[in-house]
């Protein structure tokens, strides 16, 4: 069923490592080779896509963008003939090495001037034969989009409608042109099942990488990512349609399904930097870390400060580089440990809690706040009895913030398409302010169920506001009237123009506003029997500034 990607290129690099006492280690270096690179010549160390994103958003290029020093890496490999470089992180100035040396940490610490920190992050229980045939590929064909604005979501109708993202779809924002990367534990059979067939045919699966076992295809095993991806990308009209079916996708395996070690956080960091190199707009993952197979490692509540976990640190750096990062809040809400995990507690990450399709909090959805008192979760979407696509080609129900997070990420992708010039922080801020509990956040769902039509309107608002507006709802249901309040500091004359798009006839009305709050009511025509819904464009002018809003009517 999968369309072959004939333009993909494959990298084949095979090394054979016969392990005696193998382990993997994270080393954070104490300095970078500042003579090797120059901020004035970013082409030497940043991809064209990364440079373009920085130019677009006015993001400065800094020494943080410089690669890890090759000289330092060579020193490590020269100290230990069994040492093999696995991955690097330029943002955190560190690297992961494989070694068979029986006392690798002591060996490296003897050269302490080179490093700030070293720890063992993975232990192999038995000697292993590593055959690293890299299955990384990229699709060079031009992506196409053949998806209408008016969608039949099938079983997934309510899980889409509860966040009002269907209104963004109706406005034409389904994620087209937005690149979204998923970091997960494998996407078994995703290249074969019906839910994603359209994406392969339209060349919107742009790249795939397995960081954990580079020799294995991400489609080979590990079914968690398959269900996660379907929440965003499923396109089976009448059966299941995801929250952003028109996105371009990168699929990256960071999770080792065999074990739970700290190295998975480092894999996650590598995946973020990979996304940066590709110019990715949004990264989502349904992963979290508090406990590990090595019980000497433990993320206690005091670790939920955004400054402890390497993954959490990297998440905030990614946002500073122009990306938006979304993560599941976690599924510990009904357990002794009921808090969110890392990296969901990162300052600028959007941590997503779970609800059912009528708005009840899922009992398993993890609680905030962070250790330093910040509100979490940042929003909520359906993750309880969620309809998802599975590796056996069936559409079934599943539970977990693993599903609410990608559902949410797809909705954010629709906003990103609608506002390509807004910064990541501006979009994150609008999303948080659009939560039902924003005025009175709690520890259960944080800012609450997010209204993405409200977020859209918040991003429409001008910065130079003489007037402030309060809409109880941006969707008019069962009545023919628009109602909202306008607050002004002084008496002001305004003109309001509004229209139903299907009718195309503009109505106008003048108001003399008094200082303080003013109630506004505008009549709108009934929908014809042929129309299930319509969009209302609202333009308010005070003679100095125009204020634009978009409402839905059904």
Which sequence ranges carry the predicted segments?
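Primarily auto-inhibitory N-terminal propeptides
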Residues: 20-80, 95, 102-106, 114-129
């Amino acid at each position: 069923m999968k369309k072959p990607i004939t333009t993909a290129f494959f990298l084949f690099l095979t090394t054979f490592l016969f392990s005696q006492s193998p382990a993997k280690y994270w080393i954070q270096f104490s300095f970078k080779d500042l003579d090797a690179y120059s901020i004035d010549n970013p082409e030497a160390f940043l991809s064209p896509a990364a440079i373009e994103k920085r130019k677009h958003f006015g993001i400065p290029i800094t020494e943080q963008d410089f690669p890890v020093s090759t000289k330092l890496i060579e020193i490590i490999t020269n100290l230990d003939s069994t040492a093999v470089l696995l991955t690097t992180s330029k943002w955190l100035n560190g690297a992961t090495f494989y070694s068979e040396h029986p006392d690798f940490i002591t060996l490296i610490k003897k050269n302490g001037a080179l490093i700030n920190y070293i720890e063992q992050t993975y232990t192999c229980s038995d000697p292993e034969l590593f055959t690293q045939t890299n299955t990384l590929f990229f699709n060079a064909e031009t992506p196409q989009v053949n998806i209408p604005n008016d969608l039949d979501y099938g079983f997934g109708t309510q899980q889409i409608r509860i966040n009002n993202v269907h209104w963004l779809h109706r406005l034409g924002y389904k994620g087209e042109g937005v690149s979204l990367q998923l970091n997960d534990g494998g996407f078994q059979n995703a290249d074969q099942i019906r839910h994603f067939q359209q994406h392969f045919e339209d060349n919107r699966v742009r790249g795939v990488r397995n960081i954990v076992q580079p020799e294995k295809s991400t489609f080979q095993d590990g079914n968690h990512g398959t269900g996660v991806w379907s929440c965003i990308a499923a396109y089976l009209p009448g059966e299941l349609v995801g929250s952003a079916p028109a996105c371009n996708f990168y699929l990256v395996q960071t999770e080792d399904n065999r074990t739970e070690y700290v190295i998975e956080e480092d894999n996650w960091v590598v995946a973020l930097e990979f996304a940066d190199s590709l110019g990715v707009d949004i990264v989502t993952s349904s992963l979290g870390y508090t406990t590990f197979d090595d019980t000497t490692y433990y993320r206690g509540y005091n670790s939920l400060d955004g400054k402890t976990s390497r993954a959490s640190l990297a998440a905030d750096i990614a946002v500073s580089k122009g990306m938006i990062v979304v993560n599941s809040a976690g599924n510990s809400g009904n357990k002794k440990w009921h808090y969110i995990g890392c990296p969901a507690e990162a300052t600028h990450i959007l941590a997503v809690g779970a609800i059912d399709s009528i708005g009840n909090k899922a009992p398993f959805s993890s609680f905030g706040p962070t250790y330093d008192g910040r509100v979490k979760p940042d929003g909520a979407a359906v993750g309880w009895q969620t309809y998802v696509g599975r590796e056996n080609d069936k559409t079934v129900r599943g539970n977990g913030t693993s599903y609410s997070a990608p559902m949410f990420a797809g909705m954010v992708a629709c906003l990103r398409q609608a506002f390509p010039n807004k910064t990541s922080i501006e979009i994150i801020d609008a999303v948080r302010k659009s939560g039902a509990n924003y005025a009175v956040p709690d520890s259960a769902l944080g800012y609450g169920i997010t209204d993405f039509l409200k977020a859209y309107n918040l991003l429409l608002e001008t910065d130079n506001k003489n007037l402030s507006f309060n809409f109880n709802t941006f969707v008019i249901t069962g009545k023919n009237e628009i109602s909202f309040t306008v607050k002004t500091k002084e008496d002001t004359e305004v003109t309001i123009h509004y229209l139903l798009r299907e009718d195309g006839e503009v109505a106008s009305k003048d108001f003399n506003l008094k200082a303080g709050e003013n109630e506004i009511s505008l009549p709108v025509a009934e929908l014809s029997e042929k129309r299930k819904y319509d969009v209302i464009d609202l333009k308010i002018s005070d003679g100095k500034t125009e204020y634009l809003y978009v409402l839905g009517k059904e």
